[in-house]
Curated annotation (Swiss-Prot):
PANTHER family for the chain: 60 KDA HEAT SHOCK PROTEIN, MITOCHONDRIAL (PTHR45633)
Enzyme class label: isomerase
InterPro entries: Chaperonin_Cpn60_CS (IPR018370), Cpn60/GroEL (IPR001844), Cpn60/GroEL/TCP-1 (IPR002423), GroEL-like_apical_dom_sf (IPR027409), GROEL-like_equatorial_sf (IPR027413), TCP-1-like_intermed_sf (IPR027410)
Source organism (scientific name): Sulfurovum sp. (strain NBC37-1)
Name of the protein in question: Chaperonin GroEL
Subunit structure: Forms a cylinder of 14 subunits composed of two heptameric rings stacked back-to-back. Interacts with the co-chaperonin GroES.
Protein keywords: ATP-binding, Chaperone, Cytoplasm, Isomerase, Nucleotide-binding
Enzyme Commission code: 5.6.1.7
GO cellular component, as recorded: cytoplasm
Catalytic activity: ATP + H2O + a folded polypeptide = ADP + phosphate + an unfolded polypeptide
């Protein structure tokens, strides 16, 4: 296929057109008075959202040159969401503002490479200033404030997220699911839960709930498949004498072995239940080790030279309570050594830091949560499916932003932190490097201006008042139209969101400004369908 090549100003101007179209669609969602964007879907009802990254992901432009610019900035929005969890709109607005200012200077004759150098130095200096003015998140109230801001000022969602983080800790897993009704709810599973249910309904002890509940049980863990009870008889006799319930977690338990256990359970000889081991392959081995450490058991595996026929009560784990339904098993109050659990948690944290796979990272974090706290499920309710999708987007955003705030701390919100940090930066640069730095120092006012503009206020007046005020925490509350102490008003942003948004925006704008040529496909006109040949008159017609 033939390619189209554009150079210098023509290339950059085409890219800028694409960036502008994407930014214009995304930036209207910004702030407490941001507008909705309606997205057509190939099937079903249109999707209404105020989530910047959801809007950006849907945009594909017809012009190939413009589309290249839009796709690069779309990537910035996605990367910011992946890394910081929020700040997609901020990153898009910043990238557009930096590119616009930079393009004007480069068209006027500035050296793109020196401009880029100055931009990088100014961006790094602003991030250092942001770190200086940030503060740690100390209590549940501040967590709720961050979550509320990210959820577009929805206090109910903010409080639910704060409650969830309070219950399961910062390493706990918090998931978002759709509720059956219209109300939002929080459900916390304390202890370790894994997605394996009882192997036979005959193990059920609570017929009303169809669950098997065990108090103070012993737990036998093996990676072997059990088909015969012959090897288990010695340890089962010891358990019967102790009078305690037994949970067997094995690779599988079937045939004669399962039938015999069910029979003993029904006769009241043994209070017993069995479940399959969670996970697959190497992950299964690691999860069995996790359960063993949590309960103080030894994993009976041939790899360590252990066999079921030699197992004793010392090899079994213990827990305060176990609840099993047809799909899940929950182990509460494992009696394992707390130092061993802490060491295992530290080991998994190192694996999380070192892994490059997002899937592996997610699974490791789930294991971490199960060992260190528990799992919280935020159930989001809404009257319609369209509202449900929009609300779920907001909860996901708020949850990610809250985790970012706990990680790195918070700064004043509403775009004011970037403006204040910019004002504090003093750089001694010359020539086009100074031009590049000035581009960044001016561009970081764009998010604050956009928030004010979306709320119907004069963006220039708002920016000027905040920039020239010496009060460190002063900002503009776009919801009320007042100038307030942002920390006291609870209008705060995670430092990580502001930092990542500025870094990513500077990076992509630098790439676009130093682009000297573009190569793209020539869009071919569709070939017209061939016309039908003339059939002539049909014979024999009168």
């Amino acid at each position: 296929m033939a390619k189209e090549i554009f150079f210098s100003d023509k290339a950059r101007n085409g890219l800028f057109e694409g960036v502008t179209k994407l930014a214009d669609a995304v930036k209207v969602t910004m702030g407490p008075r941001g507008r909705n964007v309606l997205i057509q879907k190939s099937f079903g009802a249109p999707h209404i959202t105020k989530d910047g990254v959801s809007v950006a992901r849907e945009i594909e432009l017809e012009d190939t040159l413009e589309n290249m610019g839009a796709q690069l900035v779309k990537e910035v929005a996605s990367n910011t969401a992946d890394e910081a969890g929020d700040g997609t709109t901020t990153a898009t607005v910043l990238a557009h503002s930096i590119f616009k200012e930079g393009l004007r200077n480069i068209t006027a004759g500035a050296n793109p490479i020196e401009v880029k150098r100055g931009m990088d130095k100014a961006s790094a200096a602003i991030i250092e200033e942001l770190k200086k003015i940030s503060k740690e998140v100390k209590d549940k109230k501040e967590i709720a404030q961050v979550a509320t801001i990210s959820a577009n000022s929805d206090e109910t969602i903010g409080n639910l997220i704060a409650e969830a983080m309070d219950r399961v800790g910062k390493d706990g897993v918090i998931t978002v699911e759709e509720a059956k009704g219209i109300n939002d709810d929080l459900e916390v599973v304390e202890g370790m839960q894994f997605d394996r249910g009882y192997l036979s309904p005959y193990f059920v002890t609570n017929t009303e709930k169809m669950t098997c509940e065990m108090e103070n049980p012993l737990i036998l863990i093996t990676d072997s498949k059990i088909t015969s009870l012959k090897d288990l008889i010695p340890v089962l006799e010891q358990i019967q004498q102790s009078g305690r319930p037994l949970l067997i977690i094995s690779d599988d338990l079937e045939g004669e072995a399962l039938a015999t256990l069910v029979l003993n359970r029904l006769k009241g000889v043994l209070n017993i239940a069995a479940v399959k081991a969670p996970g697959f392959g190497d992950r299964k081995k690691e999860m069995l080790k996790d359960i063993a450490i949590l309960t103080g058991a030894n994993v009976i595996t041939e790899e360590l030279g252990l066999s079921l026929d030699k197992a004793t009560l010392d090899d079994l784990g213990q827990a305060g309570r176990v609840v099993i339904d047809k799909d899940n098993t929950v182990i509460v109050d494992g009696k394992g050594d707390s130092a061993a659990v802490d060491a295992r948690v530290a080991e998994i944290k190192i694996q999380v830091e070192n892994t490059t796979s997002e899937y592996d990272k997610e699974k490791l974090q789930e294991r971490l949560a199960k060992l260190s706290g528990g799992v919280a499920v935020i159930k989001v309710g809404a009257a319609t499916e369209t509202e449900m999708k929009e609300k779920k987007d907001r909860v996901d955003d708020a949850l990610s932003a809250t985790k970012a705030a706990v990680d790195e701390g918070i700064v004043i919100g509403g775009g004011a932190a970037l403006a204040k940090a910019s004002k504090a930066v003093k750089l001694d640069l010359e020539h086009d490097e100074a031009v590049g730095a000035e581009i960044i120092l001016r561009a970081v006012y764009a998010p604050m201006k956009q928030i004010a503009q979306n709320a119907g206020f004069d963006a220039g007046v708002v920016a000027d008042k905040i920039a020239n005020n010496s009060e460190a925490n002063l900002g503009f509350n776009a919801a009320t139209g007042e100038y307030v102490n942002m920390l006291e008003a609870g209008i705060i942003d995670p430092l990580k969101v502001a930092r990542v948004a500025l870094q990513n925006a500077t990076s992509v704008a630098s790439l676009l400004l130093t682009t000297e040529a573009t190569v793209s496909d020539i869009k071919e006109a569709p070939t017209p369908a061939p016309t039908m040949p003339d059939m002539g008159g049909m014979p024999g017609m009168m």
